[in-house]
């Protein structure tokens, strides 16, 4: 080799050596270059950060601090003691313990301006159902410094259901009201505050109905209702009447809210109701603040002091203390969209969000369509129909195969169900999209997929916007569409600057890396390995979208997953939520899914297989997440215990009861509609001293109608129901009729102390609630006789007692630890009598 050749070789080697990137550049390229290892790192970090932030945001222990000021410490200590005393025993309206709670509260407030409300009301509480109620609400008024401001109502109910100690529902609400009362006693509020410690919310919102008839109601403009439909945890802003009042919740120290639950009420996904409904229908503006999980302990003996903490109580109470200090309320009365994240509260009128949605829905198609036309026509982006088949095909298959086999498992293991379903969905997308990519390679299939996902979000956003004010919980769709469509638009803009093959590469190259091994460089496309636009696209789309979907979806699932026990319709709804949740979790990563490395695919496969196997082997209920059964004992011609629950579980539980085995009682199980069943048996543990005597009074005929009356004697009783044949009874009275039928006005009327209700369409049921334990019920009615009878009519009377009864004590004591018990009716035992009039 000549000296010149040696010199040239040395120069080339020196040039190659000096052109090698330094360690920093190599590190950046290894992390942000479009490599499987880089994508794996990004995915793992996204999962960890998303789950971590969501856990922190929803954690009571990490986000709520106990009070530090001396006054607030004393208030919390006193209110916690109040809660312990209130929830010592179940205290339903039909129990003596209810009177004890009433007297306990009255003793606390006796030095303040209060009224032991004695309203008697009568109204139509349902179709063909009329209710008569005697109230003993406790009302307290604290006058504000500015008498021109409308008063604020604070409301909570002090009754429980007969099967529960009523700690969360609604002892914590009552204890919070007492805490606020002690606070305003030391700090005069600007506006007058009226406290309604109301009774008998559980069986018809009667305490709230009674307050609406009270003279103090006329002072009230706003309200805050405190409730509980779970057992501890954080108190969430369930719903608000309008934006003007909702935005004041941003002033509390620990805001925790989502309008997703508000939409659940509006769309009748959540079936239970609170006093909020009564106050809103009466024209007030306000909020519903409530504990919301877990529902399998709701209305059971597990709603006790052991399952809550002072920190839960303080979360509700401190927010109530802050809310009562609100200033002037905005006049805006349109529905509100609201949420919180990491303690920051966001609220906007639904119309403002609708305007944003309309702009996005129009803007992105208008901008992206011309860009796509230019790219395809002038930039030689070759697209075929098969390029667009992957996402819809995978989405359809994922919906078809995504449901886990054990339908009840979501009640106790929601995370396992979601993880299994999501893993299956990811694997379906992975297989289908790689198949499409193999059949018909695109120069930028990733961007094609982004556009397809953007279109999916666009369609959903059209539906959300068109649906209007009832869909206040779907604000996340706006965020998802914005980040996805914006990133797709950036990709299209990048393509417009791409030179036709042979030119220079653009800054946002549309090229996509092809490689064999993870560290193998593509020698045919040396510039592609330094393509970093994918990392920008990933960071714009995936972290934000994943957090929005995961946090919202998990909040919804934790709030409703226990309702899978309530009916087949609820089961279908829950699994629809799971499938949609999983789909939306996966959609943000779909554009990158073909580049998942073998370790991610293997891990997802393991999760899917293990999840499916466990769903077939694991019992769906356990002590921490029990199954709820409902109990009622009916005493009459056939003394029977009735237990209601989902099909396939009730008989096994009851067959092991001592009274069933010892008496060889026959279990009679009957399938009910919607996936439920009822099992009946003769207990032999009939409660004593429960008597109901029904006597008839002479009847008279007037204008084709027959008037009759009965007297119901039920000692130590507060609750009875009179059942009439459908559509025959046209008027009822608690007392005695003073006028003939034609003289009675339609609806409710009162005459000489008698409470009358007339409905020409027919009254099938009269509910009676009284305060005097031993006073007889006097009920009159007028009915239209059938042509083929002789004017007679059979009436059924059922009276309920809420105190513990032997048969109920037995099922609680001897049932498995994965079962909890709740009442089926207004009491645990009902005595039934029939009478012909």
Curated annotation (Swiss-Prot):
<feature type="topological domain" description="Cytoplasmic">
    <location>
        <begin position="1"/>
        <end position="36"/>
    </location>
</feature>
<comment type="similarity">
    <text>Belongs to the peptidase M28 family.</text>
</comment>
<keyword id="KW-0378">Hydrolase</keyword>
<feature type="binding site">
    <location>
        <position position="299"/>
    </location>
    <ligand>
        <name>Zn(2+) 2</name>
    </ligand>
</feature>
<feature type="topological domain" description="Vacuolar">
    <location>
        <begin position="620"/>
        <end position="837"/>
    </location>
</feature>
<feature type="transmembrane region" description="Helical; Name=8">
    <location>
        <begin position="573"/>
        <end position="593"/>
    </location>
</feature>
<protein>
    <recommendedName>
        <fullName>Vacuolar membrane protease</fullName>
        <ecNumber>3.4.-.-</ecNumber>
    </recommendedName>
</protein>
<keyword id="KW-0479">Metal-binding</keyword>
<keyword id="KW-0926">Vacuole</keyword>
<feature type="transmembrane region" description="Helical; Name=3">
    <location>
        <begin position="385"/>
        <end position="405"/>
    </location>
</feature>
<dbReference type="GO" id="GO:0008235">
    <property type="term" value="F:metalloexopeptidase activity"/>
</dbReference>
<dbReference type="InterPro" id="IPR045175">
    <property type="entry name" value="M28_fam"/>
</dbReference>
<dbReference type="GO" id="GO:0046872">
    <property type="term" value="F:metal ion binding"/>
</dbReference>
<feature type="topological domain" description="Vacuolar">
    <location>
        <begin position="406"/>
        <end position="415"/>
    </location>
</feature>
<feature type="binding site">
    <location>
        <position position="157"/>
    </location>
    <ligand>
        <name>Zn(2+) 1</name>
    </ligand>
</feature>
<feature type="binding site">
    <location>
        <position position="202"/>
    </location>
    <ligand>
        <name>Zn(2+) 2</name>
    </ligand>
</feature>
<dbReference type="GO" id="GO:0006508">
    <property type="term" value="P:proteolysis"/>
</dbReference>
<feature type="active site" description="Proton acceptor">
    <location>
        <position position="201"/>
    </location>
</feature>
<feature type="transmembrane region" description="Helical; Name=1">
    <location>
        <begin position="37"/>
        <end position="57"/>
    </location>
</feature>
<comment type="function">
    <text>May be involved in vacuolar sorting and osmoregulation.</text>
</comment>
<keyword id="KW-0862">Zinc</keyword>
<dbReference type="GO" id="GO:0005774">
    <property type="term" value="C:vacuolar membrane"/>
</dbReference>
<feature type="transmembrane region" description="Helical; Name=7">
    <location>
        <begin position="540"/>
        <end position="560"/>
    </location>
</feature>
<feature type="transmembrane region" description="Helical; Name=6">
    <location>
        <begin position="475"/>
        <end position="495"/>
    </location>
</feature>
<feature type="glycosylation site" description="N-linked (GlcNAc...) asparagine">
    <location>
        <position position="689"/>
    </location>
</feature>
<feature type="site" description="Transition state stabilizer">
    <location>
        <position position="298"/>
    </location>
</feature>
<dbReference type="Pfam" id="PF22251">
    <property type="entry name" value="PFF1_TM"/>
</dbReference>
<feature type="topological domain" description="Vacuolar">
    <location>
        <begin position="561"/>
        <end position="572"/>
    </location>
</feature>
<feature type="topological domain" description="Vacuolar">
    <location>
        <begin position="468"/>
        <end position="474"/>
    </location>
</feature>
<feature type="topological domain" description="Cytoplasmic">
    <location>
        <begin position="496"/>
        <end position="539"/>
    </location>
</feature>
<keyword id="KW-0645">Protease</keyword>
<keyword id="KW-0325">Glycoprotein</keyword>
<keyword id="KW-0812">Transmembrane</keyword>
<dbReference type="InterPro" id="IPR048024">
    <property type="entry name" value="Fxna-like_M28_dom"/>
</dbReference>
<dbReference type="InterPro" id="IPR007484">
    <property type="entry name" value="Peptidase_M28"/>
</dbReference>
<dbReference type="Pfam" id="PF04389">
    <property type="entry name" value="Peptidase_M28"/>
</dbReference>
<feature type="topological domain" description="Cytoplasmic">
    <location>
        <begin position="377"/>
        <end position="384"/>
    </location>
</feature>
<keyword id="KW-0482">Metalloprotease</keyword>
<feature type="binding site">
    <location>
        <position position="169"/>
    </location>
    <ligand>
        <name>Zn(2+) 1</name>
    </ligand>
</feature>
<feature type="transmembrane region" description="Helical; Name=2">
    <location>
        <begin position="356"/>
        <end position="376"/>
    </location>
</feature>
<feature type="topological domain" description="Cytoplasmic">
    <location>
        <begin position="437"/>
        <end position="446"/>
    </location>
</feature>
<feature type="glycosylation site" description="N-linked (GlcNAc...) asparagine">
    <location>
        <position position="561"/>
    </location>
</feature>
């Amino acid at each position: 080799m000549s000296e010149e050749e040696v010199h040239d070789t040395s120069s080339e080697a020196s040039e190659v050596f000096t052109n090698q990137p330094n360690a920093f550049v190599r590190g950046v390229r290894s992390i942000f270059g479009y490599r499987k290892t880089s994508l794996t790192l990004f995915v793992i970090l996204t999962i960890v950060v998303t789950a971590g932030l969501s856990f922190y945001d929803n954690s009571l222990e990490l986000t709520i601090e106990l009070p530090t000021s001396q006054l607030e410490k004393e208030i919390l200590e006193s209110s916690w003691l109040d809660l312990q005393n209130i929830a010592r025993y179940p205290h339903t309206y039909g129990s003596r313990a209810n009177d004890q709670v009433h007297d306990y509260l009255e003793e606390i407030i006796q030095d303040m301006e209060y009224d032991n409300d004695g309203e008697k009301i009568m109204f139509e509480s349902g179709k063909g159902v009329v209710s008569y109620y005697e109230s003993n609400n406790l009302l307290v008024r604290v006058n504000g410094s500015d008498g021109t401001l409308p008063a604020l109502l604070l409301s909570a109910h002090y009754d429980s259901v007969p099967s529960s100690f009523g700690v969360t529902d609604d002892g914590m609400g009552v204890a919070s009201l007492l805490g606020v009362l002690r606070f305003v006693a030391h700090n005069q509020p600007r506006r007058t505050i009226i406290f309604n410690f109301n009774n008998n919310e559980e069986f018809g919102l009667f305490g709230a109905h009674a307050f609406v008839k009270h003279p103090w109601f006329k002072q009230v403009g706003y309200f805050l209702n405190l409730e509980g439909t779970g057992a501890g945890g954080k108190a969430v802003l369930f719903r608000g009447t309008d934006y003007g009042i909702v935005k004041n919740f941003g002033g509390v120290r620990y805001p925790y809210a989502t309008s997703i639950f508000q939409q659940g009420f509006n769309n009748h996904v959540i079936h239970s109701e609170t006093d909020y409904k009564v106050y809103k229908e009466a024209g007030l503006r306000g909020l519903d603040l409530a504990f919301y999980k877990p529902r399998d302990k709701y209305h059971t003996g597990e709603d006790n002091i052991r399952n809550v903490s002072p920190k839960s109580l303080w979360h509700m109470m401190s927010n109530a203390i802050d809310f009562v200090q609100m200033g002037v309320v905005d006049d805006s009365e349109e529905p509100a969209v609201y949420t919180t994240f990491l303690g920051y509260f966001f609220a906007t009128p639904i119309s403002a969000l609708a305007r944003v949605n309309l702009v996005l829905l129009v803007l992105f198609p208008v901008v992206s369509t011309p860009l796509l036309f230019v790219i395809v026509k002038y930039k030689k982006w070759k697209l075929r129909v098969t390029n667009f088949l992957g996402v819809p095909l995978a989405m359809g298959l994922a919906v078809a195969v995504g449901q886990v086999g054990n339908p009840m498992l979501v009640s106790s293991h929601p995370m396992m169900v979601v993880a299994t379903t999501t893993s299956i969905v990811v694997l379906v997308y992975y297989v289908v999209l790689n198949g499409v990519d193999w059949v018909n390679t695109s120069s930028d299939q990733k961007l094609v997929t982004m556009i397809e996902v953007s279109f999916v979000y666009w369609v959903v956003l059209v539906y959300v916007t068109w649906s209007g004010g009832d869909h206040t919980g779907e604000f996340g769709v706006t965020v998802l569409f914005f980040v996805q469509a914006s990133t797709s638009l950036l990709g299209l803009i990048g393509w417009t600057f791409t030179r036709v093959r042979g030119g220079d590469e653009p800054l946002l190259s549309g090229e996509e890396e092809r490689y064999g091994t993870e560290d193998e460089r593509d020698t045919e496309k040396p510039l592609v390995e330094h393509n970093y636009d994918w990392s920008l696209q990933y960071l714009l789309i995936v972290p934000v979208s994943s957090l929005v979907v995961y946090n919202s979806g998990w909040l919804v699932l934790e709030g409703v997953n226990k309702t899978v026990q309530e009916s087949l319709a609820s089961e279908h709804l829950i699994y629809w939520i799971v499938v949609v949740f999983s789909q939306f979790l996966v959609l943000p990563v779909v554009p990158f899914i073909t580049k998942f490395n073998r370790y991610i695919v293997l891990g997802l496969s393991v999760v899917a297989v293990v999840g499916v196997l466990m769903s077939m082997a694991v019992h769906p209920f356990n002590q921490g997440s029990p199954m709820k059964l409902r109990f009622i004992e009916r005493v009459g011609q056939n003394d029977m215990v009735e237990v209601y629950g989902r099909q396939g579980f009730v008989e096994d539980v009851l067959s092991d009861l001592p009274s069933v085995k010892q008496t060889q009682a026959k279990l009679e199980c009957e399938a009910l509609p919607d996936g439920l069943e009822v099992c009946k048996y003769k207990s032999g543990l009939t409660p004593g001293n429960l008597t109901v005597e029904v006597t008839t009074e002479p009847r008279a005929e007037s204008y084709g109608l027959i008037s009759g009356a009965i007297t119901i004697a039920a000692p130590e009783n507060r609750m009875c129901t009179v059942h009439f044949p459908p559509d025959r009874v046209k008027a009822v009275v608690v007392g005695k009729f003073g006028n003939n039928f034609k003289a009675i006005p339609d609806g409710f009327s009162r005459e000489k102390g008698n409470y009358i209700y007339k409905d020409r369409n027919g009254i099938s049921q009269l509910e009676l609630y009284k305060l005097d334990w031993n006073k007889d019920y006097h009920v009159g009615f007028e009915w239209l006789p059938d042509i083929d009878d002789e004017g007679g009519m059979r009436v059924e009377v059922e009276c309920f007692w809420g105190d513990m009864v032997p048969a109920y004590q037995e099922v609680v004591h001897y049932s498995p630890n994965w079962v909890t018990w709740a009442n089926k009716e207004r009491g645990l035992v009902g005595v039934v009598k029939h009478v012909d009039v």
